[in-house]
A protein has these predicted regions:
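Acidic/His- and Gly-rich active-site-bordering loop/insert found
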Residues: 1-93, 111-117
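Metal-dependent amide/peptide-bond hydrolase catalytic core
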Residues: 3, 13-14, 23, 27, ...
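Short glycine/serine- and small hydrophobic-enriched flexible loop segments
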Residues: 7, 106-114, 202-208
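Short glycine-aspartate micro-motif
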Residues: 62-64, 90, 151-155, 176
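A structural signal for isolated positions on well-ordered beta-strands in alpha/beta enzyme cores
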Residues: 64, 123-125, 273
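Glycine/serine-rich anion-binding loops at beta->alpha junctions
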Residues: 89-103, 185
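Acidic/histidine-rich catalytic neighborhood of metal-dependent amide-processing enzymes
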Residues: 98-170, 212
């Protein structure tokens, strides 16, 4: 088990390193094949491949075991911080998120195979671009299709230090506001410009006001920018908004609210577009999850 953990941690496999992620996928493929699985991949040109491994007849209700192979770390991190055990604690890039979880999954499958356990068919689903939000692949669609027909799913992503089990998770969405103003020299033509920065600054307060803690919905304007030089009225400005929400009612309200904010004009002569860059659905708490 430790040897497998070390093997996975000591490979550079950040989301941008497709070759590294795919190499980890091949490592995992070999281990799962030795545990009786048939392995195949969804191949993506610009993202780590999606690994699918099956044991038993998965046309019948099966158990889905889910996770990812990539990390957030840049190339070279594995050499700088290799797999290390000190005072009973493992360190190294991705040792927690989620090479440890993948190692537990692989070890469990090996042990169950050796014990002859075959009560249910099993399907392993391991993404290669989770940390990048699957933005350059069709992995979300492909994983949902592969998970269809499962009795239940277990995600091997790391939980919290108290070893609790996560049975619900907020959804995430990202939006970008782009404001078009009118550029002008602030010395020669101080009244001629329409500052995109002024417009977007007014909108930031409106965006933040959409937060509803009781509903479980929060918004954060985490990135903002605009203009080029201090002596010119900013012709363009932008901001990027992170949204966390518990249910579809929350994200539906936020979408409508952000569109209304974009359409509202504080400074005549400016125009704003809002674009939804990313959306990941929430995992609601279900009675069936509590029973499981």
């Amino acid at each position: 088990m430790l040897a497998t953990w070390k093997l996975l941690v000591d490979r550079d496999c950040g989301s941008k390193n497709k070759a590294g992620v795919d190499a980890v996928g091949q490592d995992v493929k070999g281990i799962l094949e030795s545990a009786g699985f048939k392995v195949r991949f969804y191949e993506y040109p610009e993202a780590g491949n999606l690994l699918i491994a099956e044991r038993g007849d998965t046309t019948k209700p099966f158990v889905a075991l889910i996770g990812h192979l990539d990390t957030v770390f840049a190339d070279g991190e594995a050499a700088k911080r290799p797999f290390t055990i000190k005072d009973g604690v493992v360190t190294g890039p991705g040792c927690l998120d989620m090479k440890g979880g993948v190692t537990v999954l692989l070890s469990a499958m090996r042990i169950l195979n050796e014990a002859g356990w075959d009560r249910y068919p099993v399907k392993v689903i391991l993404a290669g671009d989770e940390e990048a939000g699957h933005q350059k692949s069709t992995a979300v669609r492909d994983m949902m299709a592969e998970a269809k027909g499962a009795l239940f799913g277990l995600n091997f992503e790391t939980s919290f230090k108290d070893n609790s089990v996560v049975i619900e998770r907020k959804g995430v969405a990202t939006f970008r506001f782009d404001v078009q103003g009118i550029g002008a020299h602030v010395g020669n033509n101080p009244k001629g410009g329409r500052s995109a920065i002024t417009e977007i600054a007014a909108k930031v307060a409106d965006i933040n006001a959409l937060t509803d803690y009781d509903e479980g919905t929060t918004l954060n304007v985490g990135v903002i920018g605009g203009g080029t030089v201090p002596n010119a009225c900013a012709e363009k400005a932008f901001c990027v908004v992170d949204v966390r929400y518990k249910g579809e009612a929350g994200i539906t309200r936020v979408r409508a609210g952000l569109k209304a904010i974009a359409d509202k004009v504080y400074l005549d002569g400016t125009h704003t577009e809002v674009t939804e860059l990313f959306y990941f659905p929430a995992m609601p708490r279900l009675e069936s999850s509590l029973e499981l």
